[in-house]
Amino acid sequence: MKNMWLLGLIILLPPLSSFAQHNDFGLGVIIGEPTGLSWKIWAGGKNALAGAAAWSLGRTDAFHLHADYLFHNFRLFPVSKGRLPFYYGLGVRFLFHENGEESTKVGVRFPLGIEYIFATSSLGIFIEIVPILDLSPGTDFDLNAAIGFRFYF
């Protein structure tokens, strides 16, 4: 499984970090379903790419990789300090089962969440719920939910 973590980092992080501007790349932790490392890179004022390399600890232990394209609405929840965008998007999830008894699952993600980005620091905290439509090896519905934080640099 250590090789899967390395593969996830090799696939997801380096190509994205080349697009990052100052304070546009965030790296942190996601806790829930799944639990692991989370990243986000802003791709303009209201859009971002986000993802995780994590463990899915639900019904079966599995290594989880996902990447999402996100749209942000900064006006829905106005705050006096910092920023609190609502976000939604579309992404992909790969689920590699540890026991080898089940096939690798590939699904489409529909993330919904909010992230508070502090005005005085480079920290963002988020909560999200994500309906997932697995397409391979068979069609199935799943639901992920998590909280997390990222440091932006």
Give short role names for the model-derived ranges.
Residues 1-23:
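Cleavable N-terminal export/targeting peptides
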Residues 35-37, 57-61, 75-77, 96-100, ...:
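Gram-negative outer-membrane beta-barrel proteins
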Residues 29, 37-41, 67-73, 90-94, ...:
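Residues on the lipid-exposed face of transmembrane beta-strands in outer-membrane beta-barrel proteins
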Residues 23-25, 31-35, 61-65, 84, ...:
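Residues that define the transmembrane beta-barrel architecture of outer-membrane proteins
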Residues 21-33, 43, 47-57, 88-96, ...:
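Transmembrane beta-strand segments that form the barrel wall of outer-membrane beta-barrel proteins
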Residues 60-62, 119-153:
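Predominantly the C-terminal beta-signal and adjacent terminal strand-loop region
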Residues 79-119:
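Mid-chain, well-packed structural core segment of small domains
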Residues 19-24, 45-46, 74-84, 102, ...:
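Short loop/turn motifs that connect adjacent beta-strands in outer-membrane beta-barrel proteins
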